[in-house]
């Protein structure tokens, strides 16, 4: 298995170094659900601003304030503790009376707004996230500037970030031990983290191998292509390659890579053979995913940050703004810009 730090770069390994998250204010995340509260219903959507506390901690505190069980408070995704983050929580509070959430007090957390909603907010039910990052102590401004320009055109690898694999890769190591011993894992959280890490690592490996090709975005026979911004995909045939290539070049279509698991991976012929060869050595992890009935899926190979802009405060400090769809990692963008010191694994997805 390729170590995360050794995954192939799309724009080559950065020439300079820099510091990500010198302080929480250097990493700002604003959640974008893609919809507004209904204004009625048995749930309450609460938009919070937090700094220095994780999402589960705030959700539990909100449940205690509302005098409801912790499981009645949900959220679309975990947000980093060591950052300034804005996100929505959802509390099930039936009845006509609206609680006064302006009285909710928690250090590092502020209620921005709240309203009734008809449906529970479920994990993953968001459109994306807007990021504002500050990179400090940048050693090579010219290199970072050119990389930002190139990313606007060519994007970045859509790798799962190091945080998916746990501190020091602990989640992936857990999956590997599980795959080797076949011992039942009864802890639901461990099962989820380990299976997710296994599948994500295999995806990253397939993408890393594909990026070694001279023309990364070249459509091949049997590729599974995804409509940009959509989850559906279809298989490319030899007769259509020229037209499909044009649409990929225009960013109408995205080449996908496999999230291995049980069932067919989605690619065929040449593309399928390539993906299978890329992870051929990882038989134990593949067998684990099949055994645990984790269904195979597809994910775009490249990621194009939207609304990308940047502003140099001075020669060694740059503020970068962009929007990413749900499931994508800001650290995968930063990885193509600078070599950073420290471990990304503490940054929540």
From Swiss-Prot:
CDD domains assigned to the protein according to its UniProt record, in alphabetical order: PseudoU_synth_EcTruD
Subunit relationships: Monomer.
Keywords of the record: Isomerase, tRNA processing
Active-site residues, record numbering mapped to chain: 31 (proton acceptor), 80 (nucleophile)
Official protein name in the record: tRNA pseudouridine synthase D
An example Gene Ontology CC term for this record: cytosol
Function (record text): Responsible for synthesis of pseudouridine from uracil-13 in transfer RNAs.
Effect of residue 129 to K: Loss of activity
EC numbers: 5.4.99.27
Natural source organism: Escherichia coli (strain K12)
Keyword Cell wall biogenesis/degradation: no
Catalysis performed (reactions): uridine(13) in tRNA = pseudouridine(13) in tRNA
GO biological process: pseudouridine synthesis; tRNA pseudouridine synthesis
Highest rank taxon of the organism: Bacteria
Gene: truD
């Amino acid at each position: 298995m390729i170590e995360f730090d050794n995954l192939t770069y799309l724009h080559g390994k950065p020439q300079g170094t820099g510091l990500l998250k010198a302080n929480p204010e250097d990493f700002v995340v604003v959640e974008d659900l893609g919809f507004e509260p209904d204004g009625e219903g048995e749930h309450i959507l609460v938009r919070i601003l937090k700094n220095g506390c994780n999402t589960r901690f705030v959700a539990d505190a909100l449940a205690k304030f509302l005098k409801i069980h912790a499981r009645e408070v949900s959220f679309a995704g975990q947000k980093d503790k060591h950052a300034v983050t804005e996100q929505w929580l959802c509390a099930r509070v039936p009845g006509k009376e609206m609680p006064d959430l302006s009285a909710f007090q928690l250090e590092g957390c502020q209620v921005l707004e709240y309203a009734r909603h008809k449906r529970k907010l479920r994990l993953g039910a968001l459109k994306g996230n807007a990021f504002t990052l500050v990179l400090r102590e940048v050693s090579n401004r010219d290199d970072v500037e050119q990389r930002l320009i190139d990313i606007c055109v060519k994007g970045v690898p859509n790798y799962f970030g190091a945080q998916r694999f746990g501190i020091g890769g602990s989640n992936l190591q857990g999956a590997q031990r599980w795959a080797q011993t076949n011992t039942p894992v009864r802890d639901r959280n461990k099962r989820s983290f380990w299976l997710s890490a296994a599948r994500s690592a295999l995806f990253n490996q397939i993408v890393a191998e594909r990026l070694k090709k001279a023309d990364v975005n070249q459509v091949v026979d049997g590729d599974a292509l995804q409509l940009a911004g959509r989850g559906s995909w279809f298989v490319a045939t030899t007769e259509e390659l020229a037209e499909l290539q044009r649409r990929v070049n225009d960013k109408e279509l995205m080449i996908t890579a496999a999230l291995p698991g049980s069932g067919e991976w989605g690619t065929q012929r040449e593309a399928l053979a390539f993906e299978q060869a890329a992870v051929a050595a990882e038989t134990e992890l593949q067998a684990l995913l099949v055994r645990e009935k984790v269904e195979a899926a597809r994910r775009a190979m490249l990621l194009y940050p939207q609304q990308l802009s940047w502003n140099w405060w001075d020669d060694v400090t740059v503020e970068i703004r962009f929007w990413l769809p749900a499931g994508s990692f800001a650290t995968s963008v930063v990885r193509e810009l600078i070599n950073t010191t420290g471990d990304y694994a503490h940054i929540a997805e």
